Curated annotation (Swiss-Prot):
Belongs to the universal ribosomal protein uS13 family. PANTHER family: 30S RIBOSOMAL PROTEIN S13/40S RIBOSOMAL PROTEIN S18 (PTHR10871), SMALL RIBOSOMAL SUBUNIT PROTEIN US13M (PTHR10871:SF1). The keyword Ribosomal protein applies. Keywords: Ribonucleoprotein, Ribosomal protein, RNA-binding, rRNA-binding, tRNA-binding. Residues 92-121 are annotated as: Disordered. One of its GO terms (molecular function) is rRNA binding. InterPro entries: Rbsml_uS13_C, Ribosomal_uS13, Ribosomal_uS13-like_H2TH, Ribosomal_uS13_bac-type, Ribosomal_uS13_CS. Part of the 30S ribosomal subunit. Forms a loose heterodimer with protein S19. Forms two bridges to the 50S subunit in the 70S ribosome. Located at the top of the head of the 30S subunit, it contacts several helices of the 16S rRNA. In the 70S ribosome it contacts the 23S rRNA (bridge B1a) and protein L5 of the 50S subunit (bridge B1b), connecting the 2 subunits; these bridges are implicated in subunit movement. Contacts the tRNAs in the A and P-sites. One of its GO terms (cellular component) is cytosol. This is Small ribosomal subunit protein uS13. GO terms for biological process: translation.
């Protein structure tokens, strides 16, 4: 099993798809990494040689991926919260940040509905 950036890449998948298991690498970036490393995108991960894996690791090393990228994202969110920006407040309150409506929908960000207090006479 190939291990790149601390992640076990699924051996049955093509190189391009397997690389997307790494946080911070999508299809486009995975394809560019494979092309730069000289690895065919349709080659299975289990069929990659050690030299090919090493070239892929070198090209991935250029990008912020996994822990570094997660830390970077968390620090930028923390900075927004500390500055007291509107976006920071939305993050803090667990509401949508990018202007989506919240009167209806937004359930993913807001979480499950709370039971409404019933008024009894």
């Amino acid at each position: 099993m190939a291990r790149i950036a601390g992640i076990n890449i699924p051996p049955q998948q093509h190189a391009e798809i397997g690389l997307t298991a790494i946080f911070g690498i999508g299809r486009t970036r995975a394809r560019k990494i494979c092309e730069a490393a000289g690895v065919p995108v349709t080659k299975k991960v289990k069929d990659l040689t050690d030299a090919e894996l090493e070239r892929i690791r070198e090209h991935i090393g250029v990008f912020a991926v996994e822990g570094d990228l997660r830390r970077e994202v968390q620090l930028s969110i923390k900075r927004l919260i500390d500055l007291g920006t509107y976006r920071g407040m939305r993050h803090k309150r667990g509401l949508p940040v990018r202007g989506q409506r919240t009167r209806t929908n937004a359930r993913t960000r807001k979480g499950p509905r709370r039971a409404a207090a019933s008024l009894k006479k």
